[in-house]
Amino acid sequence: MMKKIVLDIQSDIHAHTMERMLMQKLDDCQVVISELPDATAEWCKTHRPDVLLMEVKAYSPWMFKERMAIRDKVKQDTENCRVILFVDDDTDGELTEKVRQAKREGLIDAFLFGSVSENYFASVIDSV
């Protein structure tokens, strides 16, 4: 069964790199890149993804609180969508801890650090 993935990543270049990597590493997936955080919930409503991967930053519109609001909207329309947060673990310890706590509380299904290998990255997405 084809896995649908929506990416909401700050940098277009980074998003397209992730898209290519996922298409190479996963056998059967469709990747959609959300062009703006404000459009992510609508993209998810339209495409009904299995996985939503959102990058979290210390500034708007990629802040943790804003990402959780998008998560809430997506879960209303696509209850079975798995939410994964992507964070740069080298730059913001407090933000990284918020993401970890969200996983502990069951608000997200997984998190990924920017420092993980491509194989691990793809494996986590494939496993949820």
Question: At which residue positions do the language-model features occur?
Answer:
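Acidic, metal-coordinating helix/loop segments flanking the phosphotransfer/catalytic sites
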Residues: E35-V51, Y59-P61
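Hydrophobic/aromatic residues located in beta-strands of well-ordered beta-sheets
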Residues: V31, V83-I84
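Two-component/phosphorelay signaling modules centered on CheY-like receiver
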Residues: D12-S34
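Conserved phosphotransfer microenvironments
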Residues: L52-D77, V87-K98
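Conserved phosphotransfer cores of two-component systems
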Residues: K45-H47, K73-N80
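Conserved N-terminal glycine/acidic-rich loop preference
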Residues: M1-M2, Q10-E19, R48-K57, E94-I108
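Output/docking surface of receiver
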Residues: I9-Q10, V87-S127
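Nucleotide donor/acceptor-binding cores
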Residues: M2-K4, C81
